[in-house]
Amino acid sequence: MASKSQHNASKAKNHNVKAESQGQWGRAWEVDWFSLVSVIFLLLFAPFIVYYFIMACDQYSCSLTAPILDVATGRASLADIWAKTPPVTAKAAQLYALWVSFQVLLYSWLPDFCHRFLPGYVGGVQEGAITPAGIVNKYEVNGLQAWLITHFLWFVNAYLLSWFSPTIIFDNWIPLLWCANILGYAVSTFAMIKGYLFPTSAEDCKFTGNFFYNYMMGIEFNPRIGKWFDFKLFFNGRPGIVAWTLINLSFAAKQQELYGHVTNSMILVNVLQAIYVLDFFWNETWYLKTIDICHDHFGWYLGWGDCVWLPYLYTLQGLYLVYHPVQLSTPNALGVLLLGLVGYYIFRMTNHQKDLFRRTDGHCLIWGKKPKAIECSYTSADGLKHRSKLLVSGFWGVARHFNYTGDLMGSLAYCLACGGGHLLPYFYIIYMTILLTHRCLRDEHRCANKYGRDWERYVAAVPYRLLPGIF
């Protein structure tokens, strides 16, 4: 959206303007009973869900029903299952501490140089979106650089110098899970304490009066240590997403070690998910304007989620293929590849069209035509009035969140690569469908509050959310 700000001359209206505008960004100020129950449920059961999936693969070859049947029929007790679970080890703790420290070093102390020689890549110091309090934060965008350095050192150490086995991640997968949980809870707790005692921007904090909701959804909007270490950008991208491709490579190496070859399904999962990861880091500057940075506060949802949920559940397909080396027929493999690539194309081009429209203030061509837009206005918490444009051309004229549609197509491709033998690898598409549908509805609720009647005009122009003619 192209925005121009003009000062609101009436200071007397500022308080009311701020109160009205709070619905535009971030999480709620007040907590209804359904939200509270949902938060407590996730706090209690999300860690168990992660453990259950990983344990099911480790002890039951990825069967989701076998552990339940064993306990129900008395063949095993919960204590038996727990006793077989590998504990945290000194080796895993050292590996994880080294990993996180290295990513902190790359993020904080190595300014980006990739933008100097990679045509089209935008890195280095970049501005984020305006916050509810009217603040524009600056970020050191260097995720692609961190990914390249990390993977270069991985290949050198694992394959040339042989300092460690490329299967090292798989071999320590459950002990590393406990380490990731420790970091996830530690950073979430620290962020909450920081929000109460020494927030980076007090004007952007939200307190509901409910401990569980504050802990889960966060208090601070953009918690930082010093000038550049931004919790959101670091934990969203590093260490989880940088690790994503390394985890998959370790799973592929384990498959090679166990069976003497790597299946085409494992190659598909590695390639398709690597495309997504590289896209994330290539467009990290664009990510600064997305919902995670622009709307979500930093709490357990992001802190623990990025440390544990993302690296452990987003990689289930590769883990499953270690235990079940599926070899797809050539037509099926090509079909999965095509679905993944088409989904990625829709995802990327949809986002590119919006970015192009923003950068040029609409002075561009989309699908060979001058783009159409709905003119909108809104007022931020600091009393500034902003003007925006909502794109209704290209993919944005097909559906209001067609980028999510492409994302879901790619997610389905990851799962289909694993065949139809088990439910476990399909958790990802189920989860992403729920997540993106929820984000879609949440985003539209915010936009309705933010733009009012202008949003109604936009909905009339683009009537479908995700699937044209259906939803």
Curated annotation (Swiss-Prot):
Predominant cellular place of this UniProt entry's protein: endoplasmic reticulum
Membrane topology category: Multi-pass membrane protein
Subcellular location: Endoplasmic reticulum membrane
Pathway linked to the protein: Steroid biosynthesis; cholesterol biosynthesis
InterPro entries: ERG24_DHCR-like (IPR001171), Sterol_reductase_CS (IPR018083)
PROSITE patterns cross-referenced by the UniProt entry: STEROL_REDUCT_1, STEROL_REDUCT_2
Protein name as annotated: 7-dehydrocholesterol reductase
Gene that produces this protein: Dhcr7
